[in-house]
């Protein structure tokens, strides 16, 4: 009997999840890819991995030189 109740509970969870998912707006993968590509091309100039930060503006560069003796 408990096995049957567990299956019913699982089916109810599945139905509730499907009710939530039915209202999700969807788009074609080709449209999403085109929008992503356009976004990347638009913001490429601001991306430090695509356009390196000039050394003078790099906040992570070493501030002073030092010598390590071995």
UniProtKB/Swiss-Prot annotation:
Gene Ontology terms describing biological process: cellular response to pheromone; G protein-coupled receptor signaling pathway; nervous system development; nose development; social behavior
Modified residues (Cysteine methyl ester): 67
Coiled-coil ranges (or none): none
Covalent S-S links between cysteines: none
GO cellular component: heterotrimeric G-protein complex; plasma membrane
A Gene Ontology molecular function term of the record: G-protein beta-subunit binding
Protein name: Guanine nucleotide-binding protein G(I)/G(S)/G(O) subunit gamma-8
Organism: Homo sapiens (Human)
